[in-house]
A protein has these predicted regions:
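Acidic, glycine-rich flexible loop/linker segments
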Residues: 57, 211, 301-306, 328-346, ...
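Structured core elements
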Residues: 7, 28, 111-113, 125, ...
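Terminal amphipathic helices with adjacent charged low-complexity linkers/tails
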Residues: 42-59, 241, 277-316, 418
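Short, glycine-/Ser/Thr-/acidic-enriched flexible segments
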Residues: 13, 43, 117-119, 131, ...
Length: 423
């Protein structure tokens, strides 16, 4: 019987049908000699063993098979809580702890990351729809994180995403990544190819979660194909997500300091070129830098759009610049929303103007013509979802909720990163 937990360096780890595309892509990077944190991947079979042992298979099948919505919600909740609270099957638990103790624990923090079989594929990235757990140190916390990753397949957010893509949770499974935590001094993402043929890097101090969740405006670097800096926009840095279980404040002297130098950017460009070879085309990456250098945390296929020429009428109106998602042109009535509780105010075809563009907004993407956000960058999870759906988005647009009048007509260029409006 195949092993349920295998190191990323094992040839079998590159099988997406067992370990999901996220883990399989990382395994391919490891086997190509690229810098990836040490770790293991957990076969999706472990999830299926657990589901069966807990008697949850019938509840799982009832989520999308039932036309009774209250019944479907009850089935989803039963499955989620069962996976979260149930004891892990002994043979699976033993294999998990053996892998975990070899790379983390006893003061060595580790991470547990989702790698669903439907994740990180072309057309369904699931960016930000599942969970990752950082800075885990004890066996108990590790096992809790594993159960939480399995249960995340049945979260409301994931179920909605699957429904819009015609997927059924009962037909898929959750594999898992176990890795050493990179105590990052800086982290972010990168796009190996933009609409204009350049490369793009986002960076922020500390761990990369703040960039992925769209909670900060990151540094933005545009590189040529040789990795030389063509353009840079440095963000103001007030705090960083650190490995000390919180945020650390910055001294005023570091507010505008770059996160990366030219040599580090050239190294990232080279790594993105190699990732393109492995994923078979343009790639989107996540990375982190500590005292030992740059590590790759993720690589997935990237859809690249062509630039559009704006109508000259828009050039006469006021505009703001930001970080483009890299796809699309959209127009519509602006709907300024300051918190998620106001999303019901956003009508079909309107342009959502908001502060934080987090993955929770993914459910509204099918209904809007474009999104403008004050925080976030081109490599955030929501930007990935916007590219996937062809929704124009510009992030890091400072003062957007104050400058763009609610109800005004707005044009959003998701390729150039320009937002214009007229009364």
């Amino acid at each position: 019987m195949p092993r349920v937990v295998v190191p990323l360096s094992a040839p079998e780890a590159a099988d997406p049908s067992r370990f999901g595309a996220k883990a399989a892509n990382l395994a391919a990077l490891v086997q190509a000699g690229l810098p990836v944190p040490a770790g293991f991947c957990v076969d999706a079979r472990a999830y299926r063993i657990q589901l069966s042992a807990l008697g949850l298979e019938e509840s799982a099948r009832g989520v999308f098979s039932s036309e009774d919505r209250p019944c479907a919600r009850r089935c989803a909740l039963e499955t989620k809580l069962g996976l979260m609270q149930g004891a892990i099957v002994p043979e699976v638990r033993e294999a998990l702890l053996s892998a975990w103790r070899s790379i983390a624990g006893e003061g060595r923090p580790g991470v547990v990351r989702s790698s669903a079989l439907v994740e990180d594929r072309a057309g369904s990235s699931f960016a930000g729809q599942f969970q990752s757990y950082l800075e885990l140190e004890s066996d108990e916390d590790f096992l809790t994180a594993v159960r939480a990753c399995w249960a995340a397949l049945w979260s409301t957010r994931a179920l909605r995403y699957m429904a819009t893509h015609g997927l059924d949770c009962a037909d898929t499974a959750m594999a898992i990544l176990i890795q050493r935590l990179v105590p990052a001094g800086a982290a972010g993402g990168g796009l190996s190819r933009t609409a204009s043929g350049e490369m793009l890097v986002n960076a922020a101090p500390g761990l990369g979660a703040a960039v992925a969740q769209g909670e900060v405006v990151p540094d933005r670097y545009v590189l040529d194909r040789a990795g030389r800096v063509k353009e840079s926009a440095l963000a103001q840095k007030y705090h960083a997500l650190s490995c000390a279980h919180g945020r650390r404040a910055f001294s005023r002297a570091l507010f505008g300091a770059p996160c990366l130098d030219a040599e580090q950017l050239a190294e990232l460009a080279l790594l993105m070129h190699k990732c393109e070879e492995i994923v078979g085309g343009p790639a989107e990456i996540e990375w982190a830098r500590d005292d030992t250098g740059i590590s790759l945390l993720q690589a997935r296929p990237l859809a690249v759009a062509t630039a559009q020429v704006p109508d000259e009428i828009w050039l006469k109106h006021p505009g703001l610049n930001g970080h483009p998602s890299g796809i699309g042109w959209g127009e519509g009535r602006a709907r300024v929303v300051n918190c998620e509780c106001e999303l019901e105010r956003v009508g079909p075809g309107e342009v959502l103007v908001t502060t934080v563009a987090g993955p929770a907004l993914s459910e509204i993407l099918p209904h809007v013509s474009a999104v403008v956000a004050e925080l976030g960058g081109s490599t955030s999870h929501l930007a990935s979802l916007a590219r996937e759906r062809g929704v124009p988005m510009v992030l890091g647009v400072l003062d957007a909720t104050r400058r763009i009048p609610d109800g005004s007509t707005v044009a959003v260029d998701g390729v150039s990163g320009v937002v214009r409006w007229m009364q």
